[in-house]
Swiss-Prot record:
It holds the Pfam family Arginase. The keyword tRNA-binding does not apply. The lineage of its organism: Bacteria, Pseudomonadati, Pseudomonadota, Gammaproteobacteria, Enterobacterales. It is an enzyme of class 3 (hydrolase). This is Formimidoylglutamase. It catalyses: N-formimidoyl-L-glutamate + H2O = formamide + L-glutamate. HAMAP family: Formimidoylglutam (MF_00737). Mn(2+) 1 binds at residues 130, 155, 159, 241. Catalyzes the conversion of N-formimidoyl-L-glutamate to L-glutamate and formamide. Pathway: Amino-acid degradation; L-histidine degradation into L-glutamate; L-glutamate from N-formimidoyl-L-glutamate (hydrolase route): step 1/1. It comes from Salmonella typhimurium (strain LT2 / SGSC1412 / ATCC 700720).
Amino acid sequence: MTQWYPASPALWQGRDDSIEAPDARRLFQTVTRSETFSPENWQQKIALMGFACDEGVKRNAGRPGAAGAPDALRKALANMASHQGHERLVDLGNWVAPTPDLEGAQQALRDAVSRCLRAGMRTLVLGGGHETAFGHGAGVLDAFAQESVGIINLDAHLDLRQTDRATSGTPFRQLAQLCDAQSRAFHYACFGVSRAANTQALWREAQWRNVTVVEDLDCHDALAQMAQFIDKVDKIYLTIDLDVLPVWEMPAVSAPAALGVPLIQVLRLIEPVCRSGKLQAADLVEFNPRFDEDGAAARVAARLGWQIAHWWR
């Protein structure tokens, strides 16, 4: 059974510059850490949650280790400067999945996300493998059953695989099937896709599902496509698979990208999403601290989370 645990206070430590000025603060001084999972107490805040699970990566024959990412990313976030928007972050702990119950873990995350959103919070989830996306996305769909939900994925992979069980490569096919079951439209856009890393069968599935696909080669000029997608939906779920970044910026993932989309381009793509007023949920997935020897990759991932919280409107 998937268990919930509050985040350790030892994770939120950093340099104290408060002697300089009242606003010389860092995230470890402004993030609120909750000892209970009680989203009803935190309306209008951002629920920071960890999904400590990499069973989907293992099933997908990837490099395990992403289950340790949530706490590694908290440590990287802790010492970053606190600016506008960061005071809204409330750490609502980790959902820890026992191997091999991926399906139970996804259901627990789904229920937690739905509860947060219904309570008036927004969710920022630290994965975990990309199996995080099914639990997170399903929770968003549940919370906004009467509205159109757009799923924006920055990823080298389409993750529309067809297998006999859930993996880190199946979340968007699962979400498409959930939309089918609920008789609602499946709005999915994937930016940063590597044609070299996706079979013709996956491209055919994306075409059949009317997925908006922007290849890694074209992301430097994709703001218009992003704007069009934002305009056509009511609510947005943003998921960032860190393997969208080039291997020299993000080596610490299950499947590093030989080409990838540089961090600055990723930030420019997500800025209008964050500022749209439609973003309800976001996550960072596939970070693997086992392959981050000096902590540099954790800081790259943390900068994305920092920026999302800062821009979120």
